[in-house]
UniProtKB/Swiss-Prot annotation:
UniProt GO BP: adenosine catabolic process; hypoxanthine salvage; inosine biosynthetic process; nucleotide metabolic process; purine ribonucleoside monophosphate biosynthetic process
GO molecular function: 2'-deoxyadenosine deaminase activity; adenosine deaminase activity; zinc ion binding
Residue positions of the active site: E200 (proton donor)
Its EC number(s): 3.5.4.4
Function per UniProt: Catalyzes the hydrolytic deamination of adenosine and 2-deoxyadenosine.
PANTHER family documented for this protein: ADENOSINE DEAMINASE
Protein's name according to its UniProt entry: Adenosine deaminase
Species of provenance: Shewanella baltica (strain OS223)
Substrates-to-products reaction catalysed: adenosine + H2O + H(+) = inosine + NH4(+); 2'-deoxyadenosine + H2O + H(+) = 2'-deoxyinosine + NH4(+)
GO cellular component assignments: cytosol
Keyword Membrane: no
UniProt similarity note: Belongs to the metallo-dependent hydrolases superfamily. Adenosine and AMP deaminases family. Adenosine deaminase subfamily.
Pfam families reported for this sequence: A_deaminase
Cofactor: Zn(2+)
Length: 331
């Protein structure tokens, strides 16, 4: 099902959405943070999706517990390190870990730039111990408004040499992309690539805006593109990558069922699309799960899954030489 001759990548993976249950438990007790359960076993349902529960509100509450225990910068560094370990242990050859330093900092009033430094340090430490290639993507969390995103941008740009791209995430309906055009001009001026969560809660116009005004060359989720034939044609022609996360889309009620997921529609239209985990800690999945779902529920053939793997390598924010090195390591 997964072709071992092709690099396995995960490009849409939130570092702050992948905190281990035992880490939440340990950090909560270490810092005297009240947790919603009195044992490690009973904590899991509060921080991970159980069964077929599908609600955006419930999903976000679980996500909040993951950042709620980041009481100091050592905790941030630990979580970053464990993200590298988890990526390697799931069999990934390459992952792009994205994170929102404002969101990670807000509960315990940590310095935003300090959070960025701690993430970088944790990833560096992880790379010494695990054989996986990692790049970082900074997130501007639109839900907190323009001023907060400016603070976030400043903290991220102070360490731009450790980033490959910037992302816009959060409340797509309440905070449309045009509010952040100036922010992303600065991102482009810093020579960073751009991806954006768009077409998830809002319609195709949100995707057009992200591409034409923010400068996005990849789109996170993008499920609503299928209602706009001109956009689908544009995506295919210009090789705009769709970072698809089927299980997450089900868990957040972005789609009602796997049967209604538009992954197949994108593939049939010739759109560049790959498989990703989104918030693997909340969804309690790994990349292997997404490939199993793609075969069993989305009805992709092994040949199509191999193409999805190749798409991921093409979409990655990598130099041509790094891309070739990923393939060379599989020989």
């Amino acid at each position: 099902m997964i072709d071992t001759s092709i690099p396995l990548v995960d490009l849409h993976r939130h570092l702050d959405g992948n905190v281990r249950v035992n880490t939440i438990w340990e950090l909560g007790h270490q810092h005297g943070i009240a947790l919603p359960a009195d044992s490690l076993e009973t904590l899991a349902p509060f921080v991970q999706i159980q069964g077929k529960e599908t609600s955006l509100v419930a999903f976000l509450k679980k996500l909040d517990w993951m950042v709620g225990v980041l009481a100091d910068l050592d905790a941030v560094k630990r979580v970053a390190y464990e993200n590298v370990a988890d990526a390697a242990l799931s069999g990934l050859d390459y992952a792009e870990l994205r994170f929102s330093p404002y969101y990670m900092a807000m509960n315990h009033k940590l310095p935003i730039e300090g959070v960025v430094e701690a993430v970088v340090d944790g990833v560096k430490a992880g790379l010494k111990d695990y054989n996986v290639k990692i790049n970082l993507i900074g997130i501007l969390s639109r839900s907190f408004g323009q001023a907060a995103c400016t603070q976030e941008l400043e903290g991220l740009l102070a360490h731009k040499q450790h980033l490959v791209a910037m992302d816009l995430a959060g409340d797509e309906m309440g905070f449309p992309g045009e509010l952040f055009n100036d922010h992303f001009k600065r991102v482009r001026d810093a020579d960073l690539a751009i991806t954006a969560h768009a077409g998830e809660a809002a319609g195709s116009q949100s995707m057009w805006q992200a591409i034409q005004e923010l400068g996005a060359t990849r789109i996170g989720h993008g499920v609503n593109a299928i209602h706009d034939p001109k956009l689908m044609e544009y995506l295919a022609k210009h090789r705009i990558g769709i970072e698809s996360c089927p299980t997450s889309n089900l868990h957040t009620s972005t789609v009602a069922s796997y049967a209604e997921h538009p992954f197949r529609t994108f593939m049939d239209a010739g759109v560049l699309i790959n498989l990703n985990t989104d918030d693997p800690g909340v969804s309690a999945i790994d990349i292997n799960h997404e490939y199993r779902i793609a075969k069993a529920e989305l009805k992709l053939t092994d040949a199509e899954l191999a193409q999805v793997q190749r798409n991921g390598v093409e979409m990655a924010f990598l130099s041509d030489s790094d891309r070739k090195a990923l393939y060379a390591a599989k020989v």
